[in-house]
């Protein structure tokens, strides 16, 4: 059975827009390939090779986006409980060793933007946080080593996505 891909309405619309834009671009790239073929020797035809590469990228990305859209599970996080960490929850953490507070919101993989505090539900940190409550402690293995966190607060706030 296909695994559903949780995302907000924003994430779904973002994927849909990219899908539509690529579907629109594809025939233009096919035309570029045909025009480039008219220039003769394809072995040394940079336009031809660039257009072929672009077409391969578009086709692969269309397949990927089509799969994502088919598996999309659009979730409205404002309608979910946030007494425990879950999809759409904002969680305030304390890095116990550094005594530093950080805040993350759990979102879909296509919506993640760690620089803006949005982490995918399938990252190592998010996977360990899901189901935790205020006061719980976790140890997360990250590339820079193990880090101990305490969950200070779990709540919902409207998600602000940055383009």
From Swiss-Prot:
Residues 12-73 form a coiled coil. InterPro entries: GreA/GreB_C_sf, Tscrpt_elong_fac_GreA, Tscrpt_elong_fac_GreA/B, Tscrpt_elong_fac_GreA/B_C, Tscrpt_elong_fac_GreA/B_fam, Tscrpt_elong_fac_GreA/B_N, Tscrpt_elong_fac_GreA/B_N_sf. One of its GO terms (biological process) is DNA-templated transcription elongation. Pfam families: GreA_GreB (PF01272), GreA_GreB_N (PF03449). GO terms for molecular function: DNA binding; RNA polymerase binding. Keywords: Coiled coil, DNA-binding, Transcription, Transcription regulation. Necessary for efficient RNA polymerase transcription elongation past template-encoded arresting sites. The arresting sites in DNA have the property of trapping a certain fraction of elongating RNA polymerases that pass through, resulting in locked ternary complexes. Cleavage of the nascent transcript by cleavage factors such as GreA or GreB allows the resumption of elongation from the new 3'terminus. GreA releases sequences of 2 to 3 nucleotides. Belongs to the GreA/GreB family. This is Transcription elongation factor GreA. It comes from Nitratiruptor sp. (strain SB155-2). The gene is greA.
